[in-house]
Every structure is written in C-alpha cells, then in structure tokens.
Amino acid sequence: MTGPQDLRLGDPYPGRAHSLLVQIPTWADMVAFGQGKAAEQMKNGYPRSVVHPDIRSLGSTILAKIQSEHSDDSPDPSLLLFSGARAAQSCKDYILLLSQGRGQPIPAHWIQVYRVSIGGSSACGDPQHHHSRSAGPTLYAVLYPGAAASDAHAFWQRMGPGISSRLAQHCLRLVRQEGSGPRVEALLAASTAGSTLGASSLPDSHPVYDELRGRIAAYAYHTADGPELIQQVAASDVFLYGSGMAAIYHVHRSILAWRTGVAVHVGLLYEPTLRVLQTQGPGLWSYSLRTEADLDHLAAQLARQGSYDARAVHAIWCECPSNPILQTVDLHRLRALADQHSLLVVADDSVAGFANVDLMGVADIVISSLSKYFSGHADVMAGSAILNPNSRHHAALHRQMAVTYENSLFVDDAIRLELNSRDFPARMAHINATTQYLVTQLERHVADPASPLTRILYPSQGPSRVYYERQMRRPRRSDDGPLSRPGYGGVFSMEFADVAGASTFFDHLDVYKGLSFGADVCIAAPYMQMTGQGAATQRPQPHDSNYASETLIRFSVGLEPAEDILQRVHTALEASSRGFVAPG
C-alpha cells in the first residue's frame, strides 16, 4: 500500500476522488510553494491554491467556445469559473481595483463576464439520478488578460467562491453527452450586479441542504459557560457555502453592505482571512490581545471613536483557537466590549470544531470550514455561517445576508458532506483523545535540554487555556446512547530551536504533508513557509506567544493508532536531534 513517504510533489491522497490532500513532501517544497514557485509543477493541489484538472479542462473548453463566437482583444486570455454572477462580478472588480492601486490600470474591456449554459433541460441520462429532472448548470466565466493572472488567482484563493471539481466533472459529462458544447453569452456589468441575475445557478432545493442545515443547527445548541440563551439556532440561521473562505468573504461583504466601517481582528488570524479583511473595506485594526493591557487599549480606542464615524469599528473578528498558535482570546470580554459599542463579534471555530466549542454565547456570527472536521475525509470543500438568533442585530443581518447570498455548494458536494458528517462526534472524540495523548508525550521532549523541540502549542497548554475552557461544550448524550465528550481539538503545533532542526524533522516525518487539517489521516505543514511568510516576515521576538515562529510545524491528528503516530514523530525527532547542539 502506498504510504505518505512514497508520494511526490503534487500527488493526491491515493484512491480518493476529489482529494483536498495533496502531498508537498519536503521543507524546500513548502518554501517553494509559499513563494509561488511550486504550484506550476503541481497537477493537483488544495482546491483554492491549485486549480483542479477537471476545472482546467472545463475552462479550456469554455474559453475555446468564447474565442470562436466572440471578438476579444484581451492579450493572452485565461478564465475563472463561478456558479454565481455576483461572485464573477466581484472577481472582475477585484482585478480592476488592484491594477488601479498599482498605478497600472488594466482596461476594463479586457475583463469580461460571460454566462455559460451547460446541457439541456435533462441534466442526466439516468432517470434515477438526482440530476435527472434538473436543468443543466449555468456558470459564470471571468475572462482576463495574462497580466492579471496573479490578481485573479488571489481572488480565487482568498475569497473561495470558485466552482468545485465535482461540479466541473458534472459539466464535462454533460458537454460530452450533448456534443454541441456550452452556450456562452457576454454580460454587461450592470446585469451581473443586478439582483435577479445575481442569484446562484445552483439550486438548494434538494433535501440534503435542509438536512445539513438542520444538523449544523443542532450542533449549535448552547452549553458553554454563561447565561442560557433564549432562542436556539434554527436551520434558517445556517448559511452554506462552497468553502470556508467563501463563508468568510460573504459574511464580511454582507456586514460592509449593512454597516460601513473598520474591522478589528484580535489574536492571530488565518492568513487568507486576514487578506480578505485587509483588501475588502475601509481598513483593519490589529490587536494581539495577549494581556489585559492589550484589551484595555482596544477598549480605549473604541471609546474614542465617534458613533457615526465612517471609519468606526463595526465588527471584531477572532478564532477559537487561533491557527496555528492555538491560543484563545478572552471572548467574554470581547462580547462585553461589543455590547457596549454595538459591534458584531464574528468567530471562526474551524480549528476546534463545533463538537468541542460553543461560541453562541459570545458571537453574533460563527463561521466554520466544514471541509475540516465536520467532513473529516478531506474530499469535499464546504463552509457555513451561523447567525446567532439571540444577537440584537440578528434580523438586520439575516435580511442582508439573504439578499446577497449565492449558493456555491454543488449538490454532489452537499451529498458527500452529509454522508461524511454522520459520524462527526465519534470521530472528533477519538481525535481529541489521541491528540491530548501525543501532546502529553511530546512535552517530555520539550523538557529535555538536549532535544531540538522547544515548545508545544495546544489549547490545553499555556495561559489562554482558561479562555478556551470557558467555551468548551458540556458532555452530551446522543440519541443512540454514547456520551460525546468535548476536548481540545486535533491540531497542535511544534516549535524547534532553529530552522535546521525543524526542516530535518519535517523531511523525516512519515505523514501526509499539505495545506489542510481536520482529516482522517495526520497532516503536517511548516505554517510560515506554507503561507509564504518565512524569514521575510518581521516578528517582534522569537517564540512570542502570539505569533507563529518560522520554526513552527502545524500537526493535524487523524484516526491512526496513537502509538503509530507517536512512533513516526519519534523517528523524525531522532533525525532532528542528530544535528542539534544544545546552546550553552
């Protein structure tokens, strides 16, 4: 059987269709990937980073059709595909805005949006198939010149609304069946921004969508410390998306449409989330919130802002816990500040998973990457946003999000997600226990001065543990009997004494290595190198508790036996130790 060490750069998880897990096997490969030098060598990759082969094939077919039927003077054209017109228009606007900001504006007519109709009224020849009575999909293609390729890719990567590989596969199947190819129509900007054409072409009437919304709403019951909530989350409070970043992007844009203002992020944020907040809207304030003094500073800043200032803060963003340093901010104090100044708290629970933490008592909106633990098999992209029915802003937010919502979760992806998530609580409990065991064992190496391993980062470790534990769910007995016990999650990070020790450890670590986490197999990644930051990013001081070190390796625990995982880690540590000289 093929193991992780047998995989080369760009090889997907063996035997799993639509895998999100694609191997980036060495430290040098991760550095090259983060610098944008490895993606061209990879036929496969994480869907937001490397366009899937089926999507590329469909794009080539559509591009050829556009060029055969429409005059276009865009030099060296390429295209991206979206399931909604608003997403396509947002991509065009993003490319134009960035080019103007650099003082090298791209002519607007070089970037065009096309409506692409795939298939006829019967989308599938099999009468028993769930596509048999539905119309073929309508996609939206953004055609752009080669000079805009990096900006277009940045939108695809950070905003997350592109089509999935399953949707591309379905469209290619229809194109082959029909033989005539897709039908394309150029759209004016006014049309793509309009409310009637803005709706997604992907219907969400299939029962699987209600099943998923209901399942997620059931997990959002309130059991953490704090006052009981008057209303529990309903299925209608759950919005589904084609990725976690698509959820973040839509929530942020909806908040800006509802109330213009500056966003604040507290603690470390996932790098793509940070880029969305920085590039969309009037500005972003950053707070580390490592100490009470930091919170006091934020409180003072909020007290000084004017109530009707266009640059006043409108929302506070945070993660519970943060990725990849696994620290948790004082969410109860943030909630108090938000109530005092009529702000929103938007919290991302993707790293812990909502089987472990309950943020309904502190957040107006909870965002989750369903691609991670909820799915648990790294073979489908999805995300969700839950609106807290007890928020004073719930009605206004719900109206705004409903108006601008485009379903980007294809039905085949939704079906796979529903199947994968049936055993979510049991999987999460197993991973919690394994991860806590590994952390306990590895702490012994941290205590050894001869070990290159200097620190373990995990929610159960360090001074922010108390804040995480305030958000932990209480144990809950499910309908079929087993008691679901929350824990500290399946992600921990390791810091090493130097880059040489970290890179040697990583290169000798026999696990899957890639961009994702929260799967049924272990996944490791040097976070700073993976995200293109590395040594070039200035950090206040080594091993600062609120920043990711360039020696940090994030480790996501899977369902493998705990002793097997520990042995693999020990083998890599032994290799790292051979070249390590303890200071002093």
Curated annotation (Swiss-Prot):
Its cofactor is pyridoxal 5'-phosphate. It catalyses: L-alanine = D-alanine. Its EC number is 5.1.1.1. The keyword Glycosyltransferase does not apply. One of its GO terms (biological process) is transsulfuration. Keywords: Isomerase, Pyridoxal phosphate. It is an enzyme of class 5 (isomerase). It comes from the Eukaryota. GO terms for molecular function: cystathionine gamma-synthase activity; isomerase activity; pyridoxal phosphate binding. Alanine racemase; part of the gene cluster that mediates the biosynthesis of the unguisins, gamma-aminobutyric acid (GABA)-containing fungal cyclic heptapeptides with the amino acid sequence cyclo-(D-Ala1-D-Val2-L-Leu3-beta-MePhe4-D-Ala5-D-Trp6-GABA7) for unguisin H and cyclo-(D-Ala1-D-Ala2-L-Leu3-beta-MePhe4-D-Ala5-D-Trp6-GABA7) for unguisin I. Within the pathway, the alanine racemase ungC' catalyzes the interconversion of L-alanine and D-alanine, providing the D-alanine which is accepted by the first adenylation domain of the nonribosomal peptide synthetase (NRPS) ungA'. Belongs to the trans-sulfuration enzymes family. This is Alanine racemase ungC'.
